[in-house]
Amino acid sequence: MLKRILITNDDGFDSPGLLALKEALCDVAHLTVVAPANEKSACGHGLTLTSPLRFIKLDDDVYKLRDGTPTDCIYLALNALYEEHSKPDLIISGINLGSNMGEDITYSGTASGAMEGVIHGIPSVAFSQLLHDKNTFGFDFALAKKVVRELTLKILSGGFPLGDRKFLNVNIPYVGIEEFKGYKVTEMGYRLYGNDAHLHRNPRGEEHYWLGLHPLAWNERNNARESDFKVATEGYVSITPIKLDLTSYEDIKELEAWI
C-alpha cells in the first residue's frame, strides 16, 4: 500500500517549485496537495480566524485554498479532508523559491507548513531552493527534485529521525547536480538584517512603502557546527533540525534570581 504525503507551500498553487515537488514524488506515494490560492511568502505561522476559507478542487486530491495560509492548508486538510484513521504518513512544505535559513525561518510560510504538521503529530519537512532571485524561467529544479526524492524515500523506508514537535528544514544550494557536494547537518546561522523599508510615491504624491528582502548576510554562532547559510552557499544541502520549544533554558536560573 502506498504511503500518503500531504503537500503545501507558501508560493501558491501555481508555483514551479510545487510542480517540481510533485514531479519528484508522483511515483513514490499517494500525494494530496493543498496550497494557498495566492502567494503567502513571509506570512509566518498565521492561522486565519477572521474570514471563511474555501477549498477549490483543481484535480483529484489537488486543492487550492482561497485566502488561506500554509498553516491553514495543513490544519484544514488534516481536519476536513483526511479521516481520523488515515492521516498522511508525511507532510512536505515547498519547494520554496528562495532560502529559508537562520531567523528567516520565523517569517517563513514554508517552514510554518512543516511546523503545523508536527503540531499535529505528523513527521514534516520544509524544502527551500536557494535562488539569485524569484525569476525561475529556465530553472529545472533538477538537484531539488533529486534531494526531495532521496530524503523522502529515506524517511518513508527508515522512519523519521526526529522526535515530537520537531521538523527538518532543508535548504538546497543554487548549483547543478554535477557541482553538488553532498549533505550536511547544520545549525541555524545568525541572520543579519537592515532597513529594507522602501518609500515610494504615487502620481498624486501619496506615500506608500514596499518591504524588500535584505541581501543574504549572516554571522556564524561560534559553535563547532557549521551554519545553514555557510553550508548551502558552499554547494551542500543543509539539513537543520528545528524544534518548536523556544524556551531559553540556559537563562531560567538567572531569570529566577532576577525576579
From Swiss-Prot:
Keyword Nucleotide-binding: yes
Single GO MF descriptor: nucleotide binding
Protein name as catalogued: 5'-nucleotidase SurE
Gene name in the database record: surE
Reaction equation(s) it catalyzes: a ribonucleoside 5'-phosphate + H2O = a ribonucleoside + phosphate
Cofactor comment: Binds 1 divalent metal cation per subunit.
Residues that coordinate or bind a divalent metal cation: D10, D11, S41, N96
Keywords from the UniProt entry: Cytoplasm, Hydrolase, Metal-binding, Nucleotide-binding
Record localization: Cytoplasm
Cofactors (names): a divalent metal cation
